[in-house]
Amino acid sequence: MSEKTTCPACKAEHDPVALKANLMVCPGCGHHFRMEPNDRIDYLADTGSFAEFCKNMKSLNPIDMDGYEEKLSEAAKKTNMSEAVITGTCTIEKMPVVLALMSFSFMGGSMGSVVGEKISRAMLKGLEEKCPVIIYATSGGARMQEGIFSLMQMAKTASAAAELDRAGIPLFLVLCDPTTGGVTASFAMLGDITIAEPGALIGFAGPRVVEGTIKQSLPEGFQRAEFQQEKGFVDLICARKDQRALFVKLLKAHAGVGAQNGGAK
């Protein structure tokens, strides 16, 4: 008998198989558990349409950080992924799109040189193919084990997003729990439409760090998706079960955008 999964919000216990079938959302209270990239692909993409690229790109140890290779190996075994993001092309209701989906399970979704490169290449693939790009972001920020090389990815990904913007190619961001640090401070806030999953933690420094710095208590719900929408940082909050339908509407509304006049706005 499989071990039950406890919802951190309502404390209800769920069968893991049933929970996965419900898109990792608690049927009782609607709490959104963290979801792995391959499960998102199965839900979003037309059956059999996803074609991964940059699959075998793996991180090195550019600053010879002790234990980094071991952490990468452990993360790869745990997630069956080579890095913290999967990139590929697919169709959604027969409409072409480039997908990049991050995994918090792989070293906290931290952005090192490979993650930054893959996300940048995904955006440039959209530029090349003149089709929209959808990025699911979830990350603790820059990967400290790569030092300055990880911070360089902030500029790289932001530059790729700017290329899409200049060409008029739609970039849709979905901010998942949590999206923080250097990812928030770069490409995650540069989408044409910024979507968040319910209850997702979205910010730069986490609430505990902020409280410790300002020596004050923070308001309830600080940095959650609903708070960020109220403050204007998020355009809309979309439950997981409604995301495919939302993207069908968005892709239809933006059909042909960026393909006219050689991709120029």
Regions found by a protein language model. Give the residues of each.
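General structural feature for long, well-ordered alpha-helical segments within catalytic domains
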Residues: T6, V25, P37-R40, V115-A122, ...
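Conserved catalytic cores of soluble enzyme domains
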Residues: A137-G258
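Short, basic, glycine/proline-bearing loop/turn elements
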Residues: L72, L101-S110
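Charged, alpha-helix-enriched surfaces in structured cytosolic catalytic cores
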Residues: A21-M24, V114, G182, M189
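A structural preference for short, pocket-lining loop segments at secondary-structure junctions
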Residues: C90-M102, K118-A142
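Glycine-rich anion/phosphate-binding loops
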Residues: T79-A84, G109-L124
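Intrinsically disordered, low-complexity segments enriched in small/flexible residues
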Residues: M1-S82, T89-I92, K249-K265
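Short hinge/gating elements
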Residues: P8-K11, F104-S105, G140
